[in-house]
Curated annotation (Swiss-Prot):
Requisite cofactors: Mg(2+)
Location of region: Interaction with substrate tRNA: 43-46
The keyword GTP-binding belongs to this UniProt entry's keyword annotation: no
PANTHER family, alphabetized: TRNA DIMETHYLALLYLTRANSFERASE (PTHR11088:SF60)
Chain positions of site Interaction with substrate tRNA: T109
A Pfam family this chain is assigned to: IPPT
Name of this protein: tRNA dimethylallyltransferase
InterPro entries cross-referenced by the UniProt entry: Dimethylallyltransferase (IPR039657), IPT (IPR018022), P-loop_NTPase (IPR027417)
Function: Catalyzes the transfer of a dimethylallyl group onto the adenine at position 37 in tRNAs that read codons beginning with uridine, leading to the formation of N6-(dimethylallyl)adenosine (i(6)A).
Family: Belongs to the IPP transferase family.
Complex formation: Monomer.
Annotated GO MF terms: ATP binding; tRNA dimethylallyltransferase activity
EC assignment: 2.5.1.75
Length: 300
């Protein structure tokens, strides 16, 4: 396909991005098998161990089909920074280029993808333990509202419930006095990049079905285990889906209400993802509902 013409002369990078639940993972696995290559995850929650079902991590079987990287690289109590992710991703890309492979970078975390494909120059601000402890005493709604005041550009990029990234953006601002969004220069990589975006006209249905499938796989048990293991204050348990299931486990909502809230908040999140990716003119958009999508991507 013409999309891949710039990758014929030397190894590069194929990006598969777009809103959640549009079929990125399925297409990526099929395409990686066809191209005999690997998948690099671009998901800010899949980097954490033990957060499996609710983050839609690839299954053991899928990881046996195709090698996946940048999954389970941090402990749930760690703070995996954008700089750490970028460094590991760049090392892996270089490693596979030396093998003559063009890896796939797959996910819905726009900032992760941007950090790799545009070579963002990220502020090297070390974690501020005391500052984080003070900020963590505030409600996430308060933290996010403050971020909207001091760094509205970063706030637009970060989900309102994402305490990890909210704290990081505030941390950079407190230490340097300059918003994170104003400190990210660029040094784009020299290798060719092909960007594919997926969207779906059946997104609400897909989100509903995926939420139910997660519950069937034992999502509630996963959340209960994480609560017992790490406690109610773990920032990751305040993120999309986990927060709603945690409310249900605490008896604050019925299961049906938790499902409805998860679907609603996921739809809102998907809308923000779409807005983010639509701003990138280099992305070629395809229909994730197309059953012949892989065939259309193949040469000839």
């Amino acid at each position: 396909m013409e999309l891949f013409l710039n990758l014929e002369s030397r190894p590069g990078l194929i990006v598969i991005c777009g809103p959640t639940a549009t079929g990125k993972s399925g297409l990526a696995i099929a395409l990686a098998e066809y191209l005999n290559t690997v998948i690099l995850s671009a998901d800010s929650r899949q980097v954490y161990k033990e957060f499996d079902i609710g983050t839609a991590k690839p299954t053991v079987q899928e990881r046996q089909q195709v090698a996946h990287y940048l999954i389970d690289i941090c402990e749930p109590t760690d703070n995996c920074t954008l700089a750490q992710y970028q460094e590991q991703a760049n090392q892996l890309i270089q490693h596979f280029h030396q093998q003559g492979k063009t890896p796939l970078l797959v996910g819905g975390t726009g900032l992760y993808i941007q950090a790799v494909t545009e070579g963002l120059i990220i502020p090297r601000v070390a974690p501020q333990v005391e500052l984080r402890s003070q900020l963590a005493q505030l409600a996430q709604t308060q933290l996010y509202a403050y971020l909207q005041q001091v760094d509205p550009v970063s706030a637009q990029r970060i989900h309102a419930n994402d305490q990890v990234r909210t704290l990081r953006a505030l941390e950079v601002y407190y230490v340097t006095g300059i918003p994170l969004s104003q400190q990210q220069g660029r040094n784009p990589p020299s290798y060719p990049i092909c960007k594919i975006g997926l969207e779906s006209e059946q997104l609400t249905h897909r989100i509903q079905q995926r939420t139910l499938q997660m519950l069937e796989k034992g999502w509630l048990a996963e959340v209960e285990f994480l609560l017992k293991q790490y406690g109610d204050d773990l920032p990751l348990l305040k993120t999309l889906g986990y927060a709603e299931m945690k409310q249900h486990i605490a008896g604050e909502t019925s299961l049906e209400e938790a499902i409805q809230l998860t679907v609603l908040h996921t739809r809102q999140f998907a809308k923000r993802q779409r807005t983010w990716f639509r701003a990138d003119a280099e992305i070629t958009w395809l229909n994730g509902d197309d059953a012949q999508l892989l065939e259309k991507l193949q040469p000839g």
